[in-house]
Amino acid sequence: MIRLETILTPGRSLVNVPGGSKKRALEKVATVIADQVPELEMQDVFEKLVAREKLGSTGFGNGIAIPHCRLEGSSAPVSALLHLEAPID
């Protein structure tokens, strides 16, 4: 059984993160994940997130989005939770 605390760890849960733009926010997500998950490369995570976003926005409005993608190098689900200083639409 996969447990939530292995998918979303305290090290991948950040608040008051500077965002500025969608691209910068995705870069930050990719950096946080790659820093915490050694088998994943930041650039690969970032490129996959951007490619997924090009298929259609993962934003819900009101500053909420759930960017996601599939990563070949990941053997288990991985997530990060970032609360930005200011919402991005």
Swiss-Prot record:
One Pfam family in the UniProt entry: PTS_EIIA_2
Domain notes: The PTS EIIA type-2 domain may serve a regulatory function, through its phosphorylation activity.
TM region positions: none
Lineage top rank: taxon: Bacteria
Domain PTS EIIA type-2: 6-89
Localization (cell): Cytoplasm
Keyword Cytoplasm: yes
Organism name: Pseudomonas putida (Arthrobacter siderocapsulatus)
Major localisation: cytoplasm
Keywords of this entry: Cytoplasm, Kinase, Transferase
An example molecular function term from Gene Ontology annotations: kinase activity
Described purpose of this protein according to its UniProt entry: Seems to have a role in regulating nitrogen assimilation.
PANTHER family (alphabetical): NITROGEN REGULATORY PROTEIN (PTHR47738:SF1), PTS SYSTEM FRUCTOSE-LIKE EIIA COMPONENT-RELATED (PTHR47738)
InterPro entries: PTrfase/Anion_transptr, PTS_EIIA_type-2_dom, PTS_SugarTrans_NitroReg
Protein name per Swiss-Prot or TrEMBL: Nitrogen regulatory protein
GO cellular component, one term: cytoplasm
Residues of the active site: H68 (tele-phosphohistidine intermediate)
The keyword NAD belongs to this UniProt entry's keyword annotation: no
